[in-house]
């Protein structure tokens, strides 16, 4: 496994052999690189995940609430896949908020939802769960991120957002 460059001034080193990267350069007709800044048009790209990545099975449970530690300094998106044969209200909150301020009514047996990387910045804990009957359901949670390596060899995410086309086989990134 190769270590990735450290994000910002973080002391955390991430080792991975499951990440993919994409390098983009815009060249003029003479082959010289043209620096660019985003404007009102966003640039989108899809980065495939490593096909050798073992996708975890969904977890069968009847627990009402779950806690997820957001332990990285890198901004991440959090993705949920839920299979339930009953209507419920999906709720979530960050850190020590006293009430669940975010909720979604769900009346379908398979539900996908994401919290994008702009919403998780600065948070350390995500609590999510279900309001409704205490019945068995299956769920899976995973994360994604979109980053670039700056001139100081540090990973940054300024101007990059994880998109809704992200799934278990690809990460959707766009510059805003």
Please give the residue ranges for each predicted region.
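Regulatory and partner-binding modules of innate immune sensors/adaptors
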Residues: 152-164
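Secretory-pathway extracellular proteins and peptide precursors enriched for disulfide-bonded cysteines
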Residues: 136-138, 162-166
